Amino acid sequence: MRVKIHCKKFDTEFKMALYAMTEFAMARLVESKRLRNNLSIDVHFRHHSAEGEAMIDHDTNPYRPRHFRVVIDHHRLEEDNYGRKRDVTEWAHEVLKTLAHELVHVKQYVMGELSMRREGLCYRGVHYDVKTLTEYFELPYEIEAYG
């Protein structure tokens, strides 16, 4: 598996933790070593519209994706839901937790459980029409990702 971390101003120890987390999570989620060895995951840390997003890379086959981009907005994770600033340890924990959540979505893409179709995302062949944030958190693929 090829993992590339794109970030600025992260110390080496934290970058190593990100690599280790990615390797560990994917080893647990995707049992087939042959399949894991053919995966490519680019993790980008930058401003984004959500805390995190896992997506199929635009150059890969959408029916059997093997190349993925994970975008994490580490700036959004600096404060909790109540507006309090997190210390460095809490922030690092939230970043790793968000990375793990997005890697579950990568696993869902790899195993064919989650797929991108014309009408949007389909989970196990069913398209879910989401209108509210509450409905979004009740989606089966989000429930699995949140554990």
Q: What label would you give each PLM region?
A:
Residues 17-21, 137, 141-144:
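Soluble or luminal CAZymes and related metallo-dependent hydrolases
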Residues 49-93, 106-110:
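Active-site scaffold of zinc-dependent metalloenzymes
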Residues 12, 16, 89-94, 98, ...:
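Soluble non-cytosolic domains of exported or imported proteins
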Residues 93-94, 109-142:
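Post-HEXXH active-site segment of zinc metalloproteases
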Residues 97-110, 145:
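Active-site recognition of the HExxH zinc-binding catalytic motif
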